[in-house]
């Protein structure tokens, strides 16, 4: 299997259709289909399950993907190292990011990074903690913004401690102004996110033996804030997201007792094996976090 074959299979697996892969690679869908069939013949087994809506990896192909992604990453790192020796910075950096980091950090980090290294193509993939962890393990992304609670099996560099807060409707009355104790949350209606999105919140509930009742299950932070503001319940969320995106959202902001925080950072499979582009991005993110 050649490097070009690996690139083709990775793109098809990522995009899910031959047509989308063809557009990305500037070739025809029939050329993609023919190339994939050729690789399948070489391997001796199918790599994709074909349906009317697209293609998905077979179980056998899923076993190959980590090695394929490792080959692509090694090739990319080699190209970047050669360029660096020649006094240039070029290549691609694939970055996984969760919602609040995408909203609050990337707009302040990426433009400066691109200005300093215009030859590096920064590719951003937004997803949940579980998505990013999976992408890192398969090599789909090289770096990922994560919290410490979701990066236990990865090489994680903490950058910023972000407090968790409780947001409440305007008419909610805590026992002590500005503060809500964990036991006060029992029996209250909650606006919640999916468990793979709010792992830090779920950890707080578990540590404080809280079994909350939720009627609203929300995907993104801004929708959660809107639901709380209109009286649908309380919510726990990172302070960073509220400060940056919802200062006038009409919610009360309450400090938690006991207090809790999440540690935001960058994760990868191995810090020592990062490409030159990834190492430079880590430096930029580290400096940005230090100045906050």
Model-derived features with residue positions:
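Central regulatory/effector-binding core of bacterial HTH transcription factors
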Residues: 90-152, 218
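Flexible hinge/capping segments at coil-to-helix
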Residues: 153-190
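Hydrophobic hinge/microswitch elements
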Residues: 128-133, 137-140, 147, 196-252
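Short helix-boundary/capping micro-motifs
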Residues: 11-28
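Secondary-structure junction motif
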Residues: 174, 188-209, 274-278, 282, ...
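A short LG(V/I)-centered, amphipathic sequence patch enriched
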Residues: 40-57
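A late-sequence structural motif
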Residues: 105, 252-292
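Alpha-helical linker/hinge and terminal dimerization helices associated
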Residues: 42-43, 64-86
């Amino acid at each position: 299997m050649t490097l070009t074959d690996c690139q083709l299979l990775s793109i098809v697996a990522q995009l899910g259709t031959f047509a989308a892969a063809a557009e990305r690679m500037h070739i025809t869908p029939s050329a993609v289909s023919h190339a994939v069939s050729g690789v399948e013949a070489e391997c001796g087994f199918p790599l994709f399950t074909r349906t009317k809506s697209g293609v998905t990896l077979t179980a056998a192909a899923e076993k190959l993907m980590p090695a394929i992604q490792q080959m692509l990453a090694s090739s990319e790192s080699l190209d970047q190292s050669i360029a660096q020796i020649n006094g240039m910075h070029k290549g691609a950096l694939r970055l996984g990011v969760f919602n609040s980091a995408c909203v609050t950090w990337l707009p302040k980090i990426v433009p400066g990074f691109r200005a300093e290294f215009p030859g590096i193509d920064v590719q951003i993939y937004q997803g949940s903690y579980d998505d990013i962890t999976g992408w890192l393990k398969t090599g789909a992304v090289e770096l990922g913004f994560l919290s410490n609670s979701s990066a236990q099996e990865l090489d994680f560099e903490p950058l910023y401690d972000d407090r968790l807060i409780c947001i409440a409707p305007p008419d909610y009355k805590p026992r002590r102004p500005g503060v809500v104790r964990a036991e006060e949350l029992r029996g209250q209606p909650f606006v919640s996110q999916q468990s793979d999105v709010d792992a830090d919140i779920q950890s707080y509930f578990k540590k404080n033996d809280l079994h909350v009742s939720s009627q609203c299950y929300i995907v993104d932070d801004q929708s959660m804030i809107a639901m709380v503001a209109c009286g649908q319940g309380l919510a726990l969320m990172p302070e960073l997201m509220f400060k940056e995106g919802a200062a006038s959202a009409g919610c009360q902001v309450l400090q938690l007792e006991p207090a809790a925080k999440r540690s935001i950072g960058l994760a990868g499979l191995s810090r020592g094996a990062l490409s030159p582009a990834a190492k430079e991005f880590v430096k930029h993110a580290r400096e940005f976090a230090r100045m906050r």
